[in-house]
């Protein structure tokens, strides 16, 4: 499986052990080994080379497991002169350990600044010889056929390098040398990273950098300062509430007539008479036309108010003469109990049988028997029930129906 450089775990150089630890070159281990071999004690040494070799073959950080890629059949140890830690980047190792390790096979492909500047490389500058860098960028292996060693990099020909010979999809010859102080820079980069010409008289397209406002950053000055009252008058005259101003919805504009011409010309007349301060008064000619109610409408309104003096009665209970339809149709309870009423002649109820009137009834009033009274002998409506409760009254109503 091939990993991209961005998906690999990249450990910072400050936290790596560089160069990687090698027990064979460790002076402490060598001193202990020499002491154990030269000691008088005939017993087994504390740390034997065979034990260290077996430990290195099994669990050392320099050990390369064989299960990383299927094409790698046998495990192999890294060479002692290899300065790349396999714990940070476990990638393909060459099957033949006698071959010199190349950067491409070592699986560290993304540090490609230049051959003369080794900053950022994972290997020492001694490995960056001419043939190594050409092999790194051109893709031609110095060992001949590398088909048995698949590389994690698909192609290195597009990587920029001054030492590459055939990589020319990227050309950096036109850029100015920013590290050379002897050359005067003819091009400069603006804030967006775009090269622009540097001139003392000309300014860049960023006026806020120099602190000098330009015309593009400011709005156009207003010719006339309108007051709030002037704006309200213009809106009220130029845009009537009953006429829609937008014609996009299919509304046909009103045909200009003699009455509409005064309204259309009102804003222009107002603008001529008003000063910028907006303190000039309105004249009679410039006042908007407001339709006044006609005399016939006033007469109708007055007549309607006279016909409804109280305004509390509904259309169902109000007679044409303005009085209730049920006026004096029920006896006054206060008059029946005490014989007096505080309302007097203004009372809406009848004070005696002389004033009692028959209320307007439905034509079928008391013409049928009450079902609840016939079945149960009781009716919740009582005397107000519109149906018959007495048999005598029922017989009378039946005879009245048969007589015509």
From Swiss-Prot:
Pfam families cross-referenced by the UniProt entry: zf-CCCH
Which molecular function GO terms apply here? CCR4-NOT complex binding; double-stranded DNA binding; exoribonuclease activator activity; mRNA 3'-UTR AU-rich region binding; pumilio-response element binding; RNA binding; RNA sequestering activity; zinc ion binding
Query: Low complexity composition bias: which ranges?
Result: 150-168, 304-317
What's in the GO CC field? cytosol; nucleus
Region feature Disordered, mapped onto this chain: 134-168, 259-322
Alphabetical UniProt keywords = Cell cycle, Cell division, Cytoplasm, Metal-binding, Nucleus, Repeat, RNA-binding, Zinc, Zinc-finger
Q: In its UniProt record, which GO terms are filed under biological process?
A: cell division; negative regulation of conjugation with cellular fusion; nuclear-transcribed mRNA catabolic process; positive regulation of conjugation with cellular fusion; positive regulation of nuclear-transcribed mRNA poly(A) tail shortening; regulation of cell cycle switching, mitotic to meiotic cell cycle
Composition-biased stretches, type Polar residues, lie in: 134-149, 259-283
InterPro entries annotated for this entry? ZFP36-like, Znf_CCCH, Znf_CCCH_sf
Q: Where are the zinc fingers (C3H1-type)?
A: 326-354, 364-392
Which Gene3D superfamilies does the protein's record reference? 6.10.250.3220, Zinc finger, CCCH-type
Q: Where in the cell is it found?
A: Cytoplasm; Nucleus
**Function as written in the Swiss-Prot or TrEMBL entry:** Binds to specific AU-rich elements (ARE) in the 3'-untranslated region of target mRNAs and promotes their degradation. Binds to ARE present in the arz1 mRNA and stimulates the rate of arz1 mRNA decay. Required for coordination of septum formation with exit from mitosis. Involved in the mating response pathway. Induces sexual development and ascus formation.
Q: How does it assemble?
A: Interacts with moc3.
Name of the featured protein: Zinc finger protein zfs1
Q: Which organism is it from?
A: Schizosaccharomyces pombe (strain 972 / ATCC 24843) (Fission yeast)
């Amino acid at each position: 499986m091939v990993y991209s450089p961005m998906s690999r775990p990249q450990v910072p150089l400050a936290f790596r052990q560089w160069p990687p630890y090698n027990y064979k070159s460790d002076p402490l281990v060598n001193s202990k080994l020499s002491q154990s071999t030269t000691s008088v004690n005939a017993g087994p040494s504390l740390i034997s080379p065979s034990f260290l070799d077996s430990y290195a073959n099994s669990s050392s950080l320099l050990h390369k497991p064989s299960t990383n890629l299927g094409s790698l059949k046998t495990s192999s140890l890294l060479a002692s002169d290899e300065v790349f830690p396999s714990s940070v980047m476990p990638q393909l190792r060459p099957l033949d350990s006698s071959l010199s390790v190349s950067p491409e096979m070592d699986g560290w492909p993304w540090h490609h600044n230049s051959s003369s500047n080794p900053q950022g490389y994972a290997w020492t500058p001694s490995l960056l010889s001419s043939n190594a860098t050409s092999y790194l960028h051109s893709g031609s292996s110095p060992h001949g056929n590398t088909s048995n060693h698949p590389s994690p990099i698909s192609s290195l020909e597009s990587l920029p390098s001054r030492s590459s010979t055939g990589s020319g999809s990227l050309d950096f010859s036109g850029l100015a040398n920013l590290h050379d102080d002897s050359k005067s820079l003819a091009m400069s980069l603006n804030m967006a990273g775009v090269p622009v010409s540097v001139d003392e008289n000309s300014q860049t397209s960023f006026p806020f950098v120099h602190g000098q406002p330009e015309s593009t950053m400011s709005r156009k000055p207003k010719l006339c300062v309108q007051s709030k009252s002037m704006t309200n008058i213009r809106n009220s005259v130029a845009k009537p509430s009953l006429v829609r101003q937008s014609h996009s919805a299919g509304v046909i504009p009103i045909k200009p007539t003699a009455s509409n011409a005064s309204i259309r010309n009102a804003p222009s007349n107002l603008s001529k008479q008003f000063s910028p301060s907006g303190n000039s008064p309105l004249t009679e000619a410039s006042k908007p036309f407001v339709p006044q109610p006609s005399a016939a409408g006033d007469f109708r309104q007055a007549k309607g108010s006279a016909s409804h003096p109280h305004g509390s009665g509904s259309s169902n209970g109000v007679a044409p003469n303005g009085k209730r339809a049920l006026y004096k149709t029920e006896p006054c309870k206060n008059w029946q109990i005490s014989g007096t009423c505080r309302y007097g002649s203004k009372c809406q109820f009848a004070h005696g049988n002389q004033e009692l009137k028959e209320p307007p009834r439905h034509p079928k009033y008391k013409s049928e028997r009450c079902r609840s009274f016939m079945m149960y002998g009781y009716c919740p409506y009582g005397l107000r029930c519109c149906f018959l409760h007495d048999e005598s009254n029922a017989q009378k109503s039946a005879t009245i129906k048969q007589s015509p």
